[in-house]
Curated annotation (Swiss-Prot):
GO terms for molecular function: rRNA binding; tRNA (uracil(54)-C5)-methyltransferase activity, S-adenosyl methionine-dependent; tRNA binding. This is tRNA/tmRNA (uracil-C(5))-methyltransferase. S-adenosyl-L-methionine binds at Q191, Y218, N223, E239, D299. It comes from the Bacteria. It comes from Campylobacter concisus (strain 13826). SUPFAM superfamilies: S-adenosyl-L-methionine-dependent methyltransferases. GO terms for cellular component: cytosol. The lineage of its organism: Bacteria, Pseudomonadati, Campylobacterota, Epsilonproteobacteria, Campylobacterales. It is an enzyme of class 2 (transferase).
Amino acid sequence: MDCKYLKECGSCTLFTSYSEQISFKTDLIKQNFSHFYDGKFDLFSSSPKHYRTRAEFGIWHEGSKLSYTMHASEKGKKVFIDECPKVCEQISHLMPRLLESLQDDEILRTKLFGVEFIACKSGTLVTLLYHKKLDSEFEAAMKILASKLDVMILARSRGQKLLSGELNLVDELNVDGQIYKFSLSENAFIQPNKAVNEKMIAWAKECVQSGADLLELYCGHGNFTIPLSFKFKNVLATEISKSSIANALKNCELNGVENIKFLRMDADELMSAFAGVREFNRLKDIKLSDFNFSHVLVDPPRAGLSESVINFIRNFKNIIYISCNPETLKENLNELTKSHKVIKFALFDQFANTHHIECGVLLEAKR
């Protein structure tokens, strides 16, 4: 990737050609997981540039001049940038226009310390972060800027949130030729590499030849849930975030899905419900014994699965595990492979030019 800040900016950590990066990551995964799996490792690569649909930058002030900043490779320092080849073209084209407009407006540039971008099918959301009170004069200036740049703007300060207008964040994913629509909130967790996300979902669908019912933990706004729902009779999906559950319900409507039950419940609560040791009002309309689960899907945070969750999902014949941290995946597989065997293993290069690796594993109960 051609970048004038390469090695100076701390965002990228691999500087070889993309083919060499892929070879390095593939070899690393094979070395660490070959004792779990001796079959073919599926590799899903990324475009080496313009792949990020979400980006965050600091803002540096020098008089009336503003600069985007990133953490430098040298600890404790910043690097001033005017472009980033990793961001998608939708964000890349907007970055200089936004900065110029902010510089020209004293109300909008004063006390601004950060900018965040989310690009999707319906448009771009720009979040402006401030160390000041946001008043009516500010709100008027923000709305003018949003109209000028044809974007949605969200301004945040401590205890304040102002929107330039209606928030309409809707993205589309193309998975095996099927279009899925997703409504997002400004604080939703989204996979920043859209193209690789589509490949991850397609791979997860391939893991299911035929299924009865699916249980999903950590479902978010339904990124995997909704495409996979067409492979199952019924789906029960859990998530702790209230806003994610709200988006997930909206996304069912957008995609005409009626066989998913979403529960705002963490993994420990769900396990208590399955064990019958605690009753939940949230389950008053859901009878767990009515489900015939053939698969469980987990997409945990970097910390991986707790011991109790591992013991719980051992009760399922098929486990689809999406991991954003190979280290905790390896720890979890040490336990899971006592009862299950690895059937498929995939590597997803979500973040080109970095050491980050995401994996997908299909496990099946040993007979």
